[in-house]
Structures are given as structure tokens and as C-alpha cells.
Amino acid sequence: DPQLLPFVNLKAPLVLYLLDRRLCKMGASLGLGRVIPKLFLQAITGEMTQNALGTHSFLRTCKKVSGADLRLFVDQWINGSGCPRFLCTATFNRKKLLIEMHVRQESPAAIYAQAHPEDALASNPVSLWEGQMTVRIHEADGTPYEHVLDIKNEHQRYDVPFNTKYKRVRRNTKRFQARQAAAAAAAAGDEDAAEAIGMIDLGFGLGMWEDEDERKRWRVADWTEEDEAIMASAPYEWIRLDADFEWMAQIQFEQPDYMWVSQLQRDRDVVAQLAAVHALSQMPSLITSSTLTRTVLVTKYFYRIRAEAAYGLANCALPHLDLLGLFHLFMLFRTSYCLDVPHEGDSTSLEAPCIPKPNDFSDMADYFVRRALIHAIARVRDHRGRALVIVQRFLIYLLRYNDNSTNRFVDDYYLASIINALAGTLIPIDSAGYSTHADETYSAEAVSYTHLRAHETG
């Protein structure tokens, strides 16, 4: 079926990946790495029926090599349809010194099949998913401890033992002088200070924000004393669910923002960083905006993580936050890609003009981050769902003053992305009859520049 083939091509490699992870967990350390040579050998010796690999013969070979019982896996991921959704919570029990985890699962495919049986005649939705899920808890001593949850019911509580009786040492994000003092003490031979510094992962540090004046210029938010007290009393750093990628599922897990910040700054796994960025994007605050801005600035992050952080800043451009997310987006773009233009007011003001530097696309990671910043700025809306005038003016300036004369790469796709972003600002989220003279003026100018650039590039 040509309509079904794209879905099969998408699901098949994912199921094979899950099978490889399961085989590794069941004792076959090489997973499919031991199965594939057997299949090649069967093809060479002519043992393979009609020289074609079938599902049953493949699974039989997997069972013969690993000795694992794959019937449950086959029923759920090959013969069955759908994917689970897990809703998880974690609570620390100080009396028993353990973490109580509640896992509730849902099967959207089964729910849909019950509500629309006529549309699910050919499907075989799985109503209850079973298997093991790895939970990685980063405790106070900085050591990640892995625990395995055996999922068998729709709702189940797990008592996860806690290993560390250690009062944690956290980074004090608003007092960089403390880090400098600790470093000086460590250099002088203070073993306790050296140990404290060793527990801090400085791989994603940002030296620019060590200067107090720079922090003020960037409006960097710091944790309050209440936040720091809560953080100091927290028993663990953060928790990751399905750390070994054994499930093709949607996992919803809630933890405080400071734990997501720790995960983003201290976990070197790109998937963990992405999960932290997405979670923080749904928790807009001054701290979130500063953290995501720092993520964009630190070039050691994978460029797509930096791009996702830029998109998350658009969610922090809220009136009650004084549009801090938009301010940080403008600061990021002006600092890296704009000329220093004299301005009567504050050079960091949202009203300050943005005149771009000549294009330089030699750094491809930086190029994609640049495009992400442009689209993130274009996503900012006011409480009526309309794009801000300063956003449209910013995009118009990018088109008007674009200079590609010294760039060794063409800027066609770059200009197209700006035009696309500018066109998006003309579409309100809620188009219920709201307009002002300023909106109409800049919208008309935006439309004219869009048509002009489209004519020039066409």
C-alpha cells in the first residue's frame, strides 16, 4: 500500500532500535550486533528461504542468539499498534529515605479505538503496555544512580531507594565571587574547596557573565534567597526517565525549574538538554529567560540545542516579565550580528536600531542559530495576538540593510527565512478586528518589502 509505506519506513527502524536495546538489557551485550552476522551467514550458505528475510525467521534468529523471550515485545511493537503515554511524578520521603514514583500510563490508540470503532477495524491497539523503564537519579554527590521500573499496570507506585546521605553543594548562580574565592582557596591547598569545585561541571561555563557589569547590561536574573534555600534542601539534582531510550512513548514528567536548569547545564546528553529546554520553555520566568539566553551564548552546546533555546525565549516575552525574552533575543542578535549604531537612548533598548553586519556564513552552526533567532523574534506576540511594531521594524531593517558582498556563500535561503518570518508577523493569532494606525503603517511597509525581495530573488 503506497499510503502505508511511509509509515512502515518510519516505524521499522525505530522498532529495530528498541529491539536492540531490549536485547542488550536481556544479556546479549552486543544486541543486534550478534544477530546480523548470523543473517549474513544464512544468506551466504543458502539457508535463508528464497534468499529473503521474513519476520518470523528474523525473530527466531534473535531468540536463538540471545535466548530472550520476545513474545511480549512482538505483541506490543510489531503486531500491535499505537504508543503509550506515561505521566510520572516523584516525591522524596525523608522518613523512609526513598523516592516515591507514581507512573500512570495511557494508550491514545486504544482510547481512540473505543470512541471510533468504525475507524479502527484494521488496527490492533495495545491497551496495556508492559516492560522495563530505566530511571536515572542524579543525587547530591553528583553520582547518577540507575533504577529499573517494572511496568505492568495502568497506575503503579514504585519505591526507589535513595543512596546518598550527603549535604549537597550547589552552584550559587548569583554570586560568582564565591566560585573565584573557592578557586583561590583550592589553589592555596584547601582540600574541601578543591572537592567542592570538582563537583561542579564547568564545561558549559560562560565567562562573559562573570563580570557584574555585563550581567546588569544583559539583565541576568538570579535566584532569590528563598529559591536558594529550597535548592539547598532538595535531596537530588534531577531525574531522567527512560534514560536508555527503551520506549517509543510520550513521557510527561514534572520537576521544579531549578532541576531542569541543573539538567541543562550539567548533563552532557543532548537528549537530556533538549528535554530541559522544552520543559523550561513551558515555565516562563526571569530565571528561565536568563538560562535560555546563556544556552544560546555557550557555543559548546550542540547548535540545535541553542536554536531550541532561542525559540523558548519567545515564550518568555510576556508583559508581566517586561518582555525580557524579547530583550534577550534582541541582545543576542545585536551582540553577534549587528553594528554598533549610536542611539540617543540606551543602546540595549528595544527601540534601538538593528543594522546587520555584512553576512558571514563560514560557521554553519552559527548560521542556523542566527536563523533561529530571527524566527524566534518573529514569534513574539502581544496579549492580542499581534506582532509588535518593533519586531516588524527589526525584520525590515534586516532586509533593507542586508549585505552579502563579502560573503563566500549565497544568501538566498537566509533572505527567504527573513521574508518568511516577516510574512508570519502579518498573521495575527487572533484576527478579531483589531488594528491601529501604526500596525497598518508597518504592515504595509512589510508587505512592500516582501514583494520587493521576492521580485529581486525571483
PLM features: what roles do these ranges have?
Residues W260-R268, T293-Y301, F327-P342, I355-D363, ...:
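HEAT/HEAT-like alpha-solenoid repeats
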Residues F86, T91-R219, P235-R240:
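Beta-strand-rich binding/interaction modules
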Residues T450-T457:
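Conserved small/polar residues in nucleotide/adenosyl-binding loops
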Residues D1-R104, A110-Y112:
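Amphipathic alpha-helical substructures
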Residues H278, Y311, H375, S417-N420:
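Residue-level signature of alpha-solenoid helical repeat scaffolds
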Residues I287-T295, D322-L332, R386-F394, A432-E445:
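Short sequence/structural elements of tandem HEAT/ARM alpha-solenoid repeats
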Residues Q282-M283, N315-H320, R379-R384, A421-A432:
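Residue-level signature of the C-terminal ends
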Residues Q265-Q273, Y301-A309, D322, S362-R370, ...:
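Helix-start/N-cap signature of alpha-helical segments
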